[in-house]
Amino acid sequence: MDETHENEASDSFDPVFENSYHDDVTFNTEDDDEPPLEPRFKYERLKGEETLPFMKTATFTSIDLHDKFIAIGTATGLIYILDHHGYGNFDSVPPLKPHRCAVSKVKFDETGSYVLSCANDSKIVVSGVGNDKLCCTINIQVMPKSIYFSPDFIRQQSGHCFIMGERNLVLYEKRMFQYKASSLYSGSERDGFIHCCSWNENLIAFTNDTGTRVYERGAERIITSVQPSHDVDRVRSSRSPPKHTWMPENNLVIGWADTVTILKIRDDDGVKKGEVHHIFHVSMFICGISYIPESGIDNMELFLVGLQLEGEDFDDCASVISTVTTLTALESSACTILKTSVIRPLGLKEFELQSEDMIESVKLSNHTLPYMIHGLGIPYLATYFILTTKHIIMAVPYGPEDGIRWRLKYKLYDEALDMAKHNADLLSKTDLSPKKVGRMIIEGYLTGKRARAAASRLPLICGECKEEWEWAVNQFEEVKLCTLLAEVLPDGTPTLDPECYQKVLIACLFNNVKQFRKLVQTWSPDLYMTSFIIDRTQWRIQQISKSGNLADVDETERVLMDALAHLYLYERKYESALKILMSCQDFQIFNVIDKHQLFDLVKDQITELMNINSERALRLLLDNADSVEPSFVMEKIGRQPKLQLAYLTKLMSRNEGTEFADKAVQLYAEYDQKKLLPFLRKNANYNVNKARKLCSDKGYIEETIYLLAKSGNHYDAVKMMVREYRNMEKVIDYCKDQNDPDLWIHLLGVVAEFPAHFSQLIIEASNCLDPLLIMDKLPDDSDIPNLSEALDKLLVDYTNHAELQQCCYDSTLNDLNVLTQGLISAADESVSVNIVSRCSLCAQIIINSNQETTKKFSDIKVFKCGHIFHLACSTSEMERRQSIEEGLCIACSDQIELINV
């Protein structure tokens, strides 16, 4: 039986698939909330399929691609040349009829000028596509399993070579009149058939049951061999044939059964050898393999086409291989699904699944085997084709529109919006523009009862577009969730129609009163009609008061009243606003008064303001001191002494209110004693005697002592300090500050009443008191503790003091003697007068050579200090000053006056 027709099955095509964007694909995920992998491709029928009758009746057996054409081999031996959209011009390029049976393999040369085909009729045929110069038919004795053109087939003097694989790999090279066959590899029966071969530059790869080998032309040797990593006996190559694809930089990708192997051909000093970089298993039987060039060699991605087996005993390919002897048994135990995957190799045996599509729209029978499906691609055109026995499917990379639709389907709204914005120019005139996608997202969130998420994304979706914001407000109003817009609605750029803001305010008024108040406080009143909101707020307050159904009626009313006060302020109804704020005891009333200068409206309600916040009320009173007299304020708060005290404290800190100093002393004494003494020290406007009597009556010791001292009654102050403090250090410091000897004597008399303190006084004040006076004041009939030690210290201190005085006297006397001796020595010295000596007053030379010496000396005046004067200069200067004693040097007198200054 013809092998190509063995187990041939007719597959049906779902008509819904024609215009689908992967919406009908079913993904098996454990978590329904987690979206599947994003598809990388969409799958379309060729547009020309409906125009070609043979497409509906033919059974396809092979396919090859060129940049311009598709070659389709059929079971009847015909080869159709179509463009990539499935259209064919059979007048110019009629169908080829090279074989009498099903076409096993078909290949284009690199230029697309010739098609190489083979079949089980033992023929290899080179057919021309608009060219017949190199056309030929070669009859052989075996049934070829694989064929491939040389890369330079059409080039002159290249030999126009191609290869054929059966058990042997044979090279056909054109001679003068016929092709010459040369065996490159001879295989045995154990090696099986060569089901796949490929040619890249001078490297020929071919695969049989024992593995994949790479043959180097020129060196004419096999440079590497890779053994299969699956069980060849269980998965026969005739049912699941291997697939090759060459990537840049001599990387060979081998897809065979459920394994993928990536082989790198390296050139080490002119010697080529192969290295396996990746080898791993996938969950399908591979029917086609290609790559995605944009990913690059270092981060390559592979495009795989295959069959996944599902059934009672077929959860994955591993179970198929382990439970079924051959794939022919699949017809009774499994169903097949056409599948594509994009994978990225990681390590030697690891890969990352980038996308996975189960194309269930293509209905395959249970008899479908991997050799019946073909997958090819033109990587640099990003175009990939899948061939079944009845259909040609084109896999086109997802565009922005497809990606957005997929994201919207799986509710990946943020990603969909990002993609729409990134491709805004491309999508501006489509139904997936950023604007329309944004609306779809909002509607999706609202339909899915995720209104809060929808609201949070409005700034990103609507941006500064007024129309979009107003549309969104209407959408939220329809679902009665306008309260969610309170935090996101723009109040600047753009500015919406007043109705939009009013809808949100009314929604918050009836559902979230705190949010309503916040909006009233933060939104500009220019955004909405304040009169309308005031009317609705008043009606709502009345409704709440009458119903009494709310659990927290008082709190709700208070919040709404606060909001109403702000609305009145916007309407400049200040009296109504202040009345509400005052009744609610709202702290904000002070800000309102300051901002709008409304003190005159509340100056009669000072007590109420004090009850709200005394600190702010006092500040308000002081800031408006010109509008209200302190006496008026004191009268208003007369029944609240603590408020009076706070007011006077603030008032006097500004050096005002001196007439209330005595009142302040009284209030401090009653309510804040800690501040009384600092006030007494700082202020000088109170009556000292009244203050002293008040402090004395209340038993305020420190304040009383201070007032006694301030009134000059130091004796009583000292006496009180000794009796109350019993701390001699403070008393002694006080006496030292006064520097009054009589006060010390008084202190001794007072301390004599307390013998326990007498020793301490002697020790602390020994330098300030006369020892004889201390001895005289010692009590005769009292036992003074530590008296001997105190007297010892007194005598030691007195002795030291006397010695210090004597030393100072001796030192001073010695200094006087030294200075006197120096003065006498200076007076005994002669004064030299020469030709360069000058008068100390007029600075002229004393000795003039034009005058006689006797005359010159009779005209000068010389002092022992060394200063020389003309007699005339000295006489006139002394007469002018009249303050210089006779016989004193004028120059020295000037220096003494300068020092004194």
UniProtKB/Swiss-Prot annotation:
Protein topology in the membrane: Peripheral membrane protein
CHCR repeat residues: 618-760
Disruption phenotype: In 1-cell to 20-cell stage embryos, there is defective autophagosome degradation with an accumulation of lgg-1- and lgg-2-positive autophagosomes and paternal mitochondria close to the nuclei. Clusters of cell corpses in the distal region of the body and show no dsRNA uptake. Reduced number of gut granules in the adult intestine. Endosome/lysosome fusion defects in coelomocytes. Double knockout with either sorf-1 or sorf-2 RNAi results in larger endosomes and larger lysosomes and thus suppresses the endosome/lysosome fusion defects in coelomocytes in the vps-41 single mutant.
Assigned keywords, A-Z: Apoptosis, Cytoplasm, Cytoplasmic vesicle, Endosome, Golgi apparatus, Lysosome, Membrane, Metal-binding, Protein transport, Transport, Zinc, Zinc-finger
Subunit description: Probable component of the homotypic fusion and vacuole protein sorting (HOPS) complex consisting of the core class C Vps proteins vps-11, vps-16, vps-18, and which further associates with vps-33.1, vps-39 and vps-41.
Superkingdom to which the source organism belongs: Eukaryota
Location of the region described as Disordered in the Swiss-Prot/TrEMBL record: 1-37
Compartment annotation: Endosome membrane; Late endosome membrane; Early endosome membrane; Lysosome membrane
Family per record: Belongs to the VPS41 family.
Span of zinc fingers (RING-type): 839-893
SMART domains the record matches: CLH (SM00299)
Organism: Caenorhabditis elegans
Taxon lineage: Eukaryota, Metazoa, Ecdysozoa, Nematoda, Chromadorea
Protein name: Vacuolar protein sorting-associated protein 41 homolog
Major location (coarse): membrane
GO cellular component terms, semicolon-separated: clathrin-coated vesicle; cytosol; early endosome membrane; Golgi apparatus; HOPS complex; late endosome; late endosome membrane; lysosomal membrane
GO terms for biological process, alphabetical: apoptotic process; cellular response to starvation; endosomal vesicle fusion; macroautophagy; negative regulation of apoptotic process; protein targeting to vacuole; vacuolar protein processing; vacuolar transport
UniProt cross-references to InterPro entries, sorted A to Z: ARM-type_fold, Clathrin_H-chain/VPS_repeat, TPR-like_helical_dom_sf, VPS41, Vps41/Vps8, WD40/YVTN_repeat-like_dom_sf, WD40_repeat_dom_sf, Znf_RING
One of the record's GO molecular function terms: zinc ion binding
Primary role: Plays a role in vesicle-mediated protein trafficking to lysosomal compartments including the endocytic membrane transport pathways. Believed to act in part as a core component of the putative HOPS endosomal tethering complex which is proposed to be involved in the rab-5-to-rab-7 endosome conversion probably implicating sand-1, and via binding SNAREs and SNARE complexes to mediate tethering and docking events during SNARE-mediated membrane fusion.
